[in-house]
Amino acid sequence: HKLQERYDLLLEDLPIIKPYQDKDSYSALHLYPIKIQVNKVKNTKKEIFEALRKNGISVSVHYIPVHTQPYYENIGFKKGCYPNAESYYQRSISIPLYFGLTLEQQDKVIESLKQVLQ
């Protein structure tokens, strides 16, 4: 949880919404998804994602709305059916958080985010 707490502290001033963590519960914290405040940044999510990847940061996408998958589109689901799921997807990426992530690696993630979001 030290890495998560460090992200919480060091990402404080960035135009993102950090994951909610209930103080009375315990989580495995296998992901650290952030929501980009797209109205406060100049780059698109795709540009941010690609810039981070180019800088060697293993960002991921979580979660693609199920109703936009080909199977569900073939049985009648359409984009716009679940606007909250689509909005979350359009603004969210997961930054590295895993056992073995070093402070130096985490610093690189943080610095890369600061560069691409400001």
Tell me the role of every PLM-derived stretch.
Residues H1-Q118:
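PLP-dependent aminotransferase class I/II
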